[in-house]
């Protein structure tokens, strides 16, 4: 059997989608690897990319080149946000690179069965002939899919195309024959088709409940790559969580581009949380990220339940009202302070994280001082800081008053020092206390309910497998299983 290598860059959404694709390839009998670990011949490399910063794009190009060198006969299928916005530049890298649009990424759920059908019918043909046929199949699939519209309708088995609806391979010299009809179905590309019932690369399950964004932040072009906000219907979310719970999963992470824009009929994200808690029994629920405006009274009621992990990552970006206005953010510094106060009023010392952009055009020393002061005062235990990266097509790309890279780098370093100090203080607060935790993939570490990643320093005879829920006591910078 052949192998497929899957590599993922960027956000949790990308990781969820890659896990889903990996599960589908395994289901069709392919070996799946991440990293250079495969013993079977690798015929396809899937690279799920990010476009948040120019460095993310550079990393994607380096990875593509590495994979092309490592696997001289394999196809590099590049998808994700970078592939959506810059397909031509990626495909110009090599004839073996095919950029599959990120907006239609859910259509890749068809790919494993397509390639399995091709493999079954190729007979004893050499690997290069199979790869040739696969390249033609991928190109045909892409051509058909990009002409279709997107829909938020959940893909039922009758809605999804089957192996009898695969693209016809024509004009491919020496390609194995594939006796299939033209790709006449479906009339739309179903969103949320990439759903992982099992997880190969992570110990914790994740579900994508929302995609896209309707906001117009000056620095971000993810909305161009992923499109308008769309949500998975509430009953489908609950069904997927219940299925994970039935399989013994101890935790699920709910993720999306902008969870504050989740809507299913009259149900918003707070309502979704309430319903999940009501309709499940043991599984713990973690939220990937939040906007300050998401912290409403209804949301606070929902997170008061002990099965909602006390870990909240806020998309903050700046502590300066002036910079927030230039960024076109929909909240003020006062809103951030209020959101943090409200979260702490409901849960005891939750882990609070935030995203910070430094060096945004026009950011002064006073603006940066406001951001530092905010992060110090609010005691954010996790600070994800990165320098502003001008993205083509965004309002900020053409803004004047650019901050020199040297100054932006100094501000990044200063914020990282503060982040380390805040984290140490938070870890010290919980030292000696008991917490719930999930055993990580390596089984040598745990991730606590409040997002402390700790090495297991004493097992106490407790048998703990990856993904299992355990009680631990924090001891200095480690965990003792109870």
UniProtKB/Swiss-Prot annotation:
Top-tier EC class: transferase
A GO CC annotation given for this chain: cytoplasm
Binding residues for [4Fe-4S] cluster 1: 11, 50, 81
Molecular function GO labels: 4 iron, 4 sulfur cluster binding; metal ion binding; N6-threonylcarbomyladenosine methylthiotransferase activity; tRNA (N(6)-L-threonylcarbamoyladenosine(37)-C(2))-methylthiotransferase
Coarse class of the protein's main subcellular location: cytoplasm
Keyword field: 4Fe-4S, Cytoplasm, Iron, Iron-sulfur, Metal-binding, S-adenosyl-L-methionine, Transferase, tRNA processing
Family annotation (Pfam families): Radical_SAM, UPF0004
Cofactor needs: [4Fe-4S] cluster
The MTTase N-terminal domain, residue ranges: 2-120
InterPro entries, per the entry: Elp3/MiaA/NifB-like_rSAM, Methylthiotransferase, Methylthiotransferase_CS, Methylthiotransferase_N, Methylthiotransferase_N_sf, MiaB-like_bact, rSAM, rSAM_horseshoe
Domain Radical SAM core: 199-425
UniProt: [4Fe-4S] cluster 2 binding residues: 213, 217, 220
EC numbers, comma separated: 2.8.4.5
Stated family: Belongs to the methylthiotransferase family. MtaB subfamily.
NCBIfam families on file: MiaB-like-C
Known role: Catalyzes the methylthiolation of N6-threonylcarbamoyladenosine (t(6)A), leading to the formation of 2-methylthio-N6-threonylcarbamoyladenosine (ms(2)t(6)A) at position 37 in tRNAs that read codons beginning with adenine.
PANTHER family: RADICAL SAM PROTEINS (PTHR11918), THREONYLCARBAMOYLADENOSINE TRNA METHYLTHIOTRANSFERASE (PTHR11918:SF45)
Full protein name: Threonylcarbamoyladenosine tRNA methylthiotransferase MtaB
Lineage, opening ranks: Bacteria, Pseudomonadati, Spirochaetota, Spirochaetia, Spirochaetales
Chain's gene name: mtaB
């Amino acid at each position: 059997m052949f192998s497929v290598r899957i590599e993922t860059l960027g956000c949790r959404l990308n990781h969820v989608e890659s896990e889903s694709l990996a599960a589908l390839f395994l289901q069709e009998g392919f070996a799946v690897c991440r990293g250079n670990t495969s013993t079977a011949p690798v015929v396809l490399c899937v690279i799920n990319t990010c476009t948040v910063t120019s460095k993310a794009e550079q990393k994607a190009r380096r990875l593509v080149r590495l994979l092309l060198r490592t696997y001289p006969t394999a196809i590099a299928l590049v998808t994700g946000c970078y592939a959506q916005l810059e397909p031509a530049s990626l495909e110009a890298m090599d004839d073996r690179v095919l950029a599959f649009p990120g907006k239609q990424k859910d259509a890749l759920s068809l790919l494993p069965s397509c390639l399995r059908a091709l493999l079954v019918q190729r007979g004893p043909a050499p690997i290069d002939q199979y790869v040739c046929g696969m390249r033609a199949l991928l190109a045909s699939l892409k051509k058909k899919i990009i002409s279709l519209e997107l829909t938020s309708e959940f893909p039922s088995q009758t809605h999804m195309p089957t192996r009898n609806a695969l693209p016809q391979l024509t004009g491919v010299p020496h390609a194995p024959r594939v006796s299939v009809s033209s790709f006449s179905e479906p009339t739309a590309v179903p969103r949320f088709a990439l759903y992982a019932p099992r997880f190969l690369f992570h110990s914790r399950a994740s579900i994508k409940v929302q995609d896209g964004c309707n906001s117009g932040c000056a620095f971000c072009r993810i909305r161009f790559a992923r499109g308008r906000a769309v949500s998975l219907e509430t009953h489908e979310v609950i069904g997927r969580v219940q299925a994970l719970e039935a399989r013994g999963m101890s935790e699920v992470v709910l993720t999306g581009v902008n969870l504050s824009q989740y809507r299913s009929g009259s149900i918003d994200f707070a309502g979704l949380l309430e319903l999940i808690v009501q309709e499940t029994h043991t599984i713990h629920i973690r939220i990937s990220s939040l906007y300050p405006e998401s912290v409403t009274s209804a949301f606070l009621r929902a997170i008061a339940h002990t099965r909602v992990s006390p870990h909240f990552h806020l998309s903050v970006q700046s502590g300066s009202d002036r910079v927030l206005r230039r960024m076109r953010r929909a909240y003020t510094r006062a809103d951030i302070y209020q959101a943090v106060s409200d979260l702490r009023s409901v849960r005891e010392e939750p882990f609070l994280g935030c995203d910070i952009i430094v060096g945004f055009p026009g950011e002064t020393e006073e603006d940066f001082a406001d951001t530092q002061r905010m992060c110090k005062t609010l005691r954010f235990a996790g600070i994800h800081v990165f320098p502003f990266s001008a993205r083509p097509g965004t309002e900020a790309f053409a803004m004047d008053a650019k901050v020199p890279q040297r100054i932006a780098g100094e501000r990044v370093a200063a914020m990282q020092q503060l982040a380390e100090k805040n984290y140490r203080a938070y870890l010290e607060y919980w030292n000696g206390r008991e917490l719930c935790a999930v055993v990580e993939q390596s089984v040598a570490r745990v991730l606590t309910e409040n997002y402390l990643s700790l090495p297991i320093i004493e097992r106490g005879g407790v048998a703990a497998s990856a993904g299992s829920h355990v009680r631990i006591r924090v001891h200095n910078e480690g965990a003792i299983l109870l």
